Amino acid sequence: MWLGVVTLFPEMFRAVTDFGVTGRAVSKGLLELQTWNPRDFTHDKHKTVDDRPYGGGPGMLMMVQPLRDAIHAAKAAAGKEAKVIYLSPQGRKLTQQGVEELAKSSSLVLVCGRYEGVDERIIQTEVDEEWSIGDYVLSGGELPAMTLIDSVSRLVPGVLGKQASAEQDSFSDGLLDCPHYTRPESLDGLDVPAVLLSGNHEHIRRWRLQQSLGRTLLRRPELLENLALTGEQEKLLADFVDTIKQDD
């Protein structure tokens, strides 16, 4: 997968290219990431990339010309039709479903805003989609872009050691992940659930599914509203609720 990032702080993306899952993906050639700095497309000695907004008001906006030229350079480097994404709190909220949609693209150009944002005409003429990682304000689009890159790259074939790792992640099936345990078997009086030590794969599968359903009900009940549960899932969830009531 090819990713181009338009940013005033390209050095921030070493966190993506040099570390962890994404770093390994880059080193294996499964993920290619290039950056373009609008400052490199300026025509004045100060490398100015911001300007005052028409109508007044606080803050500055990113200038049109350097940003647009950087986007064009990124699209040209893609060598194919690349989808241009602007990271914005006004965009569609990124969910696992959205991540799966984006992962189907072979190339993406991510535009990271700074200051008070970008000229609306850039969005109208250069941007295909706007995406948000949540209803809060950040200093720029770099962290949202890195979040998007990390989540999308996990779905690129070969990036994770086992595809099952991606399939078992929270939200991969619309549910939160189940609890996980490793050694020791007992920690400060808290024991690993016996079913996980049983070696019975079917019992373990059902326990994990039930815990995933129950955790979603307790922590993110709105997620269940959008799911059509199977008969097995409904039974496991009902048993989970009964167990909670008995414990109370």
Curated annotation (Swiss-Prot):
The keyword Transcription regulation does not apply. S-adenosyl-L-methionine binds at G113, I133, G134, D135, Y136, V137, L138. The gene is trmD. Pfam families: tRNA_m1G_MT (PF01746). Specifically methylates guanosine-37 in various tRNAs. Keywords: Cytoplasm, Methyltransferase, S-adenosyl-L-methionine, Transferase, tRNA processing. GO terms for cellular component: cytosol. GO terms for molecular function: tRNA (guanine(37)-N1)-methyltransferase activity. This is tRNA (guanine-N(1)-)-methyltransferase. Its EC number is 2.1.1.228. Homodimer.
